[in-house]
Amino acid sequence: MSSNSGIQIPSRLPLLCTHDGVLLPGSTMRVSVDTARNMQLVKSRLLKGTSLKSTIIGVIPNTRDPEHDSDELPSLHSIGTAGLAVQVVGSNWPKPHYTLLITGLCRFRVSQLLRERPFPVAEVEQLDKLEQYTEGDPADGELGELSQRFYQAAVQLVGMLDMSVPVVAKLRRLLDSLPKETLPDVLAAMIRTSNKEKLQVLDAVDLEERFKKALPLLTRQIEGLKLLQKTRKLRPDDDKRVLSIRKGGVFPGRQFSLDEEVEDEDSDDTALLERKVKAAAMPEAALRVCLKELRRLKKMPQSMPEYALTRNYLEMMVELPWSKSTTDCLDIRAARVLLDNDHYAMEKLKKRVLEYLAVRQLKSTLKGPILCFVGPPGVGKTSVGRSIARTLGREFHRIALGGVCDQSDIRGHRRTYVGSMPGRIINGLKTVGVNNPVFLLDEVDKLGKSLQGDPAAALLEVLDPEQNHSFTDHYLNVPFDLSQVLFIATANTTATIPPALLDRMEVLQVPGYTQEEKVEIAHRHLIPHQLEQHGLTPQQLQIPQDTTLQIISKYTREAGVRSLERKIGAVCRAVAVKVAEGQKVSRSEAPTEQHAEQNTDSKVEDSGIAAPPEMPIVIDHVALKDILGPPLFEMEVSERLTLPGVAIGLAWTPMGGEIMFVEASRMEGEGQLTLTGQLGDVMKESAHLAISWLRSNAKTYLLNDGSADLLEGTDIHLHFPAGAVTKDGPSAGVTIVTCLASLLSGRLVRSDVAMTGEITLRGLVLPVGGIKDKVLAAHRANLKRIIIPKRNEKDLEEIPANVRADLDFVLAGTLDEVLNAAFDGGFPSAVNHPQVLSKL
């Protein structure tokens, strides 16, 4: 049976494990390659090979369920088919993969597995050769009878095909040209049988056994076609296709596959997908859509692009947590302890979370609230959201919205677009795997807007408790219930949030911290965290509270603690260098005992390496200056108030409260008012309003020196330092009046006074916002007297008691009260006019 011209495969073959089907000798099959080992085989062997030998690979059927593929190599089937890779096509959609066109050559047996990585290689034993069958007829006897029966059945099958006469004739010539010994493999590959049955044919090494395995398959195919033909005679209007012809490569001509309507249970996993759909516990509307898509999927050939799109859609649908949820932990005492351990202060936020837990205990069907934490950077808005999730025992997912300017990021893309995908909300639910997580919508005030739509408008449905129970993502196109999701948004300011979106959220202000709170936070959380991050222990580094307070006051100026943590990290790095150098010295070779005393000092001095430091290293103000350099901020308030025409105001920014200097000077001119400092329209109007009020009350406060007009022959220049920063708002009105009154009267404003408040033309002081942040900024600057509008008295309750005790608050209802409080000894007045009360 040997042949000089027969194919001789190498004794060592790389193995391609496939679950797409069973490759038989003499047939051609397309194989999709996407696993790591198979991808590496294609890249290293097929794409880089230059000889015919490099294109011969061993194809091993993988009997393992593809769903359970893992990094481990599955147990190999003992019999495989050596194949010639005649075509390799790569693609990146929907994921990176290769499609191989492989022609089966002969069987082989795996003798020994030589290696598993990067792809398996085995020592193989060749079992048969396709060319050997061309040298003679099969032996007489039972084998000859089997081969003749098989040939006659194959001819009968071809004659039953519902095709044109030329095609049938061509198939008949193909059967006649093939050696009868090759018919079992070729016909078993052509007809639609299960992988298990094809595997039995592959395992039949003996030719007689092979005929016995393949003949029943061919007979069953013929009986099925006879039944279908009878059915068509009874129902002539039935235009269903009895079978279809698929072109493909085959030896020696072309291969034809007979495709029945019944799907292959092993090779096609749509049945598995259907079971997943039914087990996903979807709502009725979603289930109807999925079943409809499944029916379409079964009718599609896998080569259609829409097949992959539909399959990806169904896989997304079954992976969503339609009915999976976590059980909330409603223990209020445990929640209070956990929140207190995670975050210091933030009493308002903790109170709101505990209220939610209490109501959930009384009403289990309570919808999740929509909270919005508004405050300066670094105060812990994002981290408190994570703590809330831990408190409730829920999954946590953060969605960064800063810079998002496409509404498709929220609502997803429609499936008609190439590369369509769900929005961030649905993707987040898929990631956490439950339908009641805590979603943190970070930086919601920094949403953009573009030609692709407004994402803030897309959030209106998501954040509306009356609508989000039927949120419809464009990709899914079916409603999804978001009512059990706890949404928490964070923002630095509400000014840039659209009013309609802001109205849907419960806004909780998160103000900045006092110095005492920062010290406590540093020693409870920041210092232990930085010690752990830098590999240090409390026995190696200690930062006293006085040093922490010095870092806060002289090296940071912020409402939060982010910059404080960076400075503590810088201290830890400097100490880590000392500790590492000391360990290096201590590990160096120790001198002998007789030379230890005279050599120790000289070694350290000569090498220039410091001796191991004494533990613990305590950071005092001297060490702090060596590490962080000279102080970045100094309390310069008293130095800048040495001339008339300077006053201190209080401003609110998204970064927290700030003190703001206002400077004024006068010169000869034509009564003009000049404003500098990059001011907004509202602040410019406040300056003109202050000038008008002072001009109308110049005689009352003895400011005109006998002239008819306060500004006669005089120009006034009003400047707000930090000119690179845009400034606007009405709260600087009282500061401008005080500054101009100081300039025109020649009297100094008290150096420990700061003020805020809006003014009217009648001299009333109206309330403003951001009182707590402004007061904390004044406290950081060591100011002692704070002038605020009388109607802001209620806001003083939010200020910590220790801060209130350090400050003297003046509640002013009129500008007369402001001027009397801003100057030592009060501000002189010619008459005692009655107080005007605001009824606005």
Curated annotation (Swiss-Prot):
Any one Gene Ontology BP term: protein import into peroxisome matrix
GO cellular component assignments: peroxisomal matrix
Segments for region (Disordered): 583-606
Entry keywords, A to Z: ATP-binding, Hydrolase, Nucleotide-binding, Peroxisome, Protease, Serine protease
Active-site residues per Swiss-Prot or TrEMBL entry: 731, 774
Lon N-terminal domain span: 13-222
Function in brief: ATP-dependent serine protease that mediates the selective degradation of misfolded and unassembled polypeptides in the peroxisomal matrix. Necessary for type 2 peroxisome targeting signal (PTS2)-containing protein processing and facilitates peroxisome matrix protein import.
Protein name in the entry: Lon protease homolog 2, peroxisomal
Gene: lonp2
